[in-house]
Structures are given as C-alpha cells and as structure tokens.
Amino acid sequence: MQENIIIRGVRQNNLKGFDLTLPRNKLIVFTGLSGCGKSSLAFDTLYAEGQRRYVESLSSYARQFLGQMEKPDVDSIDGLSPAISIDQKTTSKNPRSTVGTVTEIHDYLRLLYARVGVAHCPRCGREISKQTVDQMVDRLLALPERTRMQLLAPIVRGKKGEHVKILENVVKQGFVRVRIDGEICDAAEAPALAKQKKHNIEVVVDRLILREDIRARLTDSLETALSLSGGIVIADIGPGESEMLFSQNLACPECGISMEELAPRSFSFNSPFGACPTCAGLGVLQKIDPDLIVPDWGKSLNENPFNVMGWSNLEPGTQAGMFFQALSEKYGFSMDTPLNRLPKEALDVILYGSGGEPLNIHYTRPNGDSHTFSAPFEGVIPTTERRAAETQSDATKAYYDGLMSQTPCPDCRGKRLRPEILAVTVGGKSIADASDLSVIDAQAFFASLTFGEKDGMIAAPILKEINARLRFLIDVGLGYLTLSRAAGTLSGGEAQRIRLATQIGSSLVGVLYILDEPSIGLHQRDNARLIGTLKHLRDIGNTLIVVEHDEDTMLAADQIVDIGPGAGEHGGQLIAQGTAQEIMACPESITGAYLSGRRSIPVPLHRKTPAGWLAVRGARANNLKNIDVNIPLGVMAVVTGVSGSGKSSLVNEIIYKTLQRDLNRAHTRPGACDGIDGLEQLDKVIAIDQSPIGRTPRSNPATYTGLFDMIRKVFAATPEAKARGYKENRFSFNVRGGRCEACSGDGILRIEMHFLADIYVPCEVCKGKRYNRETLEVLYKGKSIADVLNMTVEEALDFFSAYPRITRKLQTLYDVGLGYIRLGQSSTTLSGGEAQRVKLATELSRTSTGKTFYVLDEPTTGLHIADCERLVRVLRQLAHGGNSVLIIEHNLDVIKACDYVIDLGPEGGSGGGTLVCEGTPEDICQCEKSYTGQYLAPVLKKSRRIESED
C-alpha cells in the first residue's frame, strides 16, 4: 500500500492550487483561520473524492439511492483510502433516536432482556410463567354464559410479504375463514396483499357460544389454535369488547394477563409490538400549554389575558366576550378577578369547556335589540387544539406549534414502552430503568449482574458488547450522558464524539477518518482521554485528519498542516507543514505564533464591575439542583464547567427562554426555576449562534445586515434610474422586473443528472449576474448593481465612502474580520464562524440601548485562536456599550478574558448541577474544587495584561 496520500493542484473553493503530501497512518491536524480553506481541503476535497470513488464503483441502479458527491476541483489524488467523515452537522433530529440507539447499545439491551429477562405481571407484580390449556379453558368459561366468541390462531404477525403460500396451506388444512389486518374473509378468496406492507393474518379456528357442556370442544379448539400459531391464541369476544390474548409462554394466573413470547422487537419503542400505544413510543405528547396561552396569570378576563388567535379580544360585543360573560354569570365570578384567584372549577371551564352543558348567552344587536341563545362552551384549549388540527396553512401550523409543549405520556410516564414490557427485569431493573442510567452508572450496573449457569452463558457475549461500547463512550468524555437521552438534544460536539465512539467499536483499519473539531464542548479535563482515543484509532492502522484549533490536540498530532495566511480570498495557501515544533518555528504561521507564545489573547488589567445583577432563584431544570445564581449585567460573563454540568440547562433553558418570554414576548416554556429577579434592567435578549444567516443561495451578507436595501436606494437615486422610472424594487433579484427571469435571479441553473450528482451552471442569459440587461445598464460610479454585489467588504468601504450609513455597517463587518467576504456571497458558503461574525457585526452596527442581553453558546466553535482574539474584542465592545454578554465556553483563552466566571459542576450528569464557585477568573483559580480553576491558573499566569478599553 502507498505510504502517502499525494494531492496535486487542489483548487476547491478558495484553495490556491497547491500540492500536498500527507503520511498515512498518522494523526494530522488541519488548522488556520476561520474561512481559510481547512474544511474545503478536508471535507470538500479528501472526503468528497474518497466517497465519490466508492459510490462510482457501484452499479448505476445502486447509485441512484445514494447521495452523489460533486467531483472536487483537484488535478489528482493518489493513495486515497475509503473515507469516513465524522462532523458536527449530521446530528439526528429524529425524536426516536437516543444515545442508546445511535450507539447500538439499545439493540444489545433488547437482546439481553428478550433472552434472560424475568417477566412480571404489570398489574400485581408477581413473576409470571407459561399458561396451560386447562388454565385458558377455565378463564374463558368464567365469562358469562351465552357469550359469543371466535378463536383465532395468529400465523403472521407484522411481517411484510404477499403470504400466498401461507394462505394456500390454511385452505389445504380445511380452515374456511381468516382475519387479515382486522378484516374477516374467506380463506379461499383472500385478497392480494401488498408486498411492501406489514400484515397480520389469523386463522379462525372455531366460532362458538359458551355453555356448560362446551369444555371438550373448547379444549380441542384451543389446542388446534396453539399448534397452528406456535403457542398463541386470541379469543375475539365481539364488538365493543377487548380481545383476550392467551399464551403457552407467559401469563399471570391471578390477573389473567398474558404476554407474547419475548423477542428483541418486544423491547423496541420503534416497533408496534413494544411501543406504548398512547404515545407511539415517543414517551411524550404534544399538547397546548396553558402557560404559553396565558403569559400572565395575574390578569383578569377583562384584561385580555389570552395570547392566542381568537381569544385575544374579550370585549363585550365579541363572541369570546359573550361566552365569558355567560360563564361569569353561571359560575358566579367577576370578569375583573385575576385568573390565578378564580375558583378551580371556574378556571377549568374557561380553559377546557363546559363539557357539553349549555350556557345562556345574551347578545345585543347593533340596533339595541337583545337576543338570548343557548350553546355549550368548547373551552379555550380544546378550541385551539381543534383549530390547530384543522388548519392547512404551514404558517398557521407553525404558530400553533409554538403554543404547544411536550408533556410526558400519562400511560407509560415517558418510558416509551408497553406496561407488560416494562415489567420485564434484569437485575431488578426494566430496560427503561437501565436506559435512564448514565453511561458510568450503567457500566457499574452491568458489571454487577449475576446469572445462573444457562442464563450466564447466554448473557456473556451480549454483556461483552454492551460493556465495550459503554467504555468507548467514557473514553471520549461522555460518561455523564444517559442512554435514553434524545439524540436531538445533543450538542454538535457530543453527537460527533458518539459517532467517534461507534467507529472505535467497529474496529475498522485502513480507513481515512476526517473529523471536525472533536474537542468542541469538551472540558480541558477530558481532553487527554479524547486524544488517547484518536491515537488508538491511528495505532490500529488508520489515517486521521482532524480539523482542529485546540492546542493540546495540535501538540499531540504527528503533523500539522497550516492553511492561510488569512481567510476567504486572503487564504487558501499552504503556509506550513510539519510537527508542532516546526510550526512554532515558522515565522509566517499565525498558528505557530500562538503555539509558541509569541502572540496571545491579552487579559484586561482591571476587570469591569457589574452594573447590576439578574438573580436566578431555585434553578432545577434537568440536573440543576435547586441552585440560586447571580448573573452580572453590563459585563462579559462566562458559564463554565465540565460537559454535562448544567451550563446549557441554566443559560439556554432557564435564562434565555425566560428573557425571551418576558422581554421579547415569545412563546417559550423555560426550564424549571422559582423565578428571575432584575429583568426590568433589560429591554431585549438576543442569541448569537453559528447557524446559517440564510438557508438559500438568495440570502447573503448584504441582505442579512440590511445593506442591500440602502444600496438599492443609491441605485434608484441615480439619474439613469430616475429617467427610466426605476424604483428600489427594480434592483432586487427576488421580484420580477429587474431580475433575470431565465434563472429567477439565482444566477445559476440546476441541471439534474439522475445517476450523477446534480450540477450547477451559470445562467447563459445573465452570465451569473442575476439581473436583466436593462437593470445592469444603470451604473453608479461606473459599476452596476451586480458589480457591487461582487465587491468585497474592503472594496465597498472605499466605493461607498460618501454614504455614512452604508460605511457604518461595512466598517463593523470589516472590524470583525470579514473584510474579505463579498457582499453578494451566498450564505450557504459561509462557515459557522463567519455567519456568527456577520450577526455580531449586525448587532454592533445598531444603535445600542445599553439594555440588551446577549447569549452565546460556545462561540469559539470553528474559530482559530486569532479569530477568538477578534471575537473577544467585539464582545467587549458590546459590553462597553452597557450591554450584558453571557457565554457558555470551555476555551481557556476566552474564559481568562471575561470579567466574571460562573463555574458549575463539579462533575457531569447526576454529579453536576451545583454552583462550584463564582467571581473573577482570578477568584476561580483560587477555588480548589473547580476543575476550570485548575486548568485556568497556569494559562492566566503567563498571559499579558492590557488596559481595559473603557
């Protein structure tokens, strides 16, 4: 096998056509500024080409079912292995995906419980075993005499196929009737079944009426049914009655509850055989939330307390007002009484209706005539639920979704499974109880299990697989997660490390792994364990390319590839390649300057004093342990702690959602807490994350920041535009008139290639300029609107120097390090760090009220340390304007530059959720219990200090 991966002439995106040789079976870090071309090289070139070559080796029939990747712009790549990408963008949002299912631990748990689980009666709790035919007969004869029933033998249960042979055998055996998917029909004339659908087929063995002398016939029929089905028989009692299921396998003799033979699918909440029928295995139900439709329970009906369409106006003449007036008369309460002081009965009627009982409603016509009619009151919540179910509008559905919240299923209490399945235990715990354990606790639980000789032989290989996967999760720093944790609630870093743990479990060799910042979301304490995992993958014979900015990972790498020197058009060059020491010695490498200590993020000489406080009382969302926390205002504050310590629960679930609800009037349901004091010091809350600034190629930095509106006004004010009668909308590529209609203003056309990836070509009519010829003839300072959109921020600053409002917005984009991006650059091509800085620039360009609360969740994701220095400067600007900045962060270089630190922990999961310490970074370093303080102290000690910009 070739010893190196040799890349020649790589020009993907902004890469400048350089050659690169990468050693195989090494740990290689790609680094450089945000937008320099790291991801273009790692993912868009190496991974894309590795994947493309694999897919092209398949048949054209197979290729149409796989996402075909575009051929990267590169002359050649030799020595390329099959590539596996582990990034942060493919987190599953499926509500059925959990940590257990993603890692396949749940699959092994299902097998374990099906093979060695002990079944119990879900009603009385006693251990249950197989039923005899005599017990079945006695149960049926206990029914009222003259009861009509039919005995059914299930021969197909939830299996796909046409089942022609099975039905032919039924006829040959002399049976006349079958029940197919709930419908009785003649066996000889059974309908053709859909091959791709799951079906249930039951043979009608006997139809009878219960009498005293029927025991012998009943016994014979039961034995026939049991032999046909393999031990299961259904007694169909008739319409309106529930069927009785009997099993030779498992049944409670006391309660008469029977269970089917336990199989792995019985323990799956994604299978109808195991899922709770009420919530379909989701564990939760979507319901209209009273707290979201009544933001303030201290308001009376006369103060219009309902924040929902149709109920927001309760004036006497409105339909809603008439109903509530009738309710107040019937139940004897005043329309001026606050809702939280109304009798429970009256409040229940207002919210949930009169239960069909009519009300006498008085109506006065405009001419003064009075009219009375009777009608039941449906209730605010049932009416809203009905309207949500009936609407066909996506926008209206989204509106009603905002009024709903998830509530635990009342039947399974959030456990997702049927009660009889939850009654099966191993080591005294149900499969749901075992899944609710953290990974660390689960490892201890499975290690403590003991079995008899037979069960021990069955369980041993299953437990070996479970324990191996649990150990891999602990090795990547995820020991605090529970196996039942929904995959959609994981951060990008957590999801990526789960996939990394899964890959370790697969034990593949000879593979090219490409990872995107695996250290994100990981506390410095757990870094060594993660690096050990990466080295293990390398040592068993794989090549690892890691896009990373973490100092520890770079120092542990066999080789570093530094791309730069700048970002966008100023990047895309190979600056340096070699060991960490060689990179440090390279004078052209910005990365080397920071690694060697020649450059660093400075620390303010004097920390800014808080201008006020938010007091969070009794925070207990998720694992928070009823803590009181004071959040400083007017400064740059950071919440720290190991992964799973409760940072996101405090900041995102409690603080941000409460401020959104109370300041921004948003439909949110904050995490559990007693309240937050001090909100009157703020006027709005804004979250600045790394999500794209737009989802389509039409959105760009100019449209997002509001620059494009101003630029269109400039063009509409030119003499040529006025002479032609062009208004501002003429210069929009989103509406008819000025845009090129051949491409609808996109500038590109999508060509569908069927068995190959779709390709995008410039529009032949406008040549990619988006506008028609007439619009492009209007010039300002010799440039058309298309020319302006193609300018960089740096070029536009000089071009629009006569317009202060435009230059102010452009200057903020330049100040946050985005001078290289083009005004019309598609938002889909911006990195997460670039998108975040566009949002920050937009905020900086606004007139500050000094009362804004900014929330940032790990803003350094994807940022080089030089980008982090610029980010800290921008955040300080926001704080120096009187605003408050609250960050969740693990990056020690950012933590040391903050004014105030709130450290949660001490551990993750159940071992976290407490306030370890709070104060300035210097105070945190003095706290012996703080892991953050232990790692922050040496970093703070060697940092240079500067005067604050106040």
Predicted feature descriptions by range:
Residues 1-950:
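Conserved phosphate-binding elements of NTP-dependent enzyme cores
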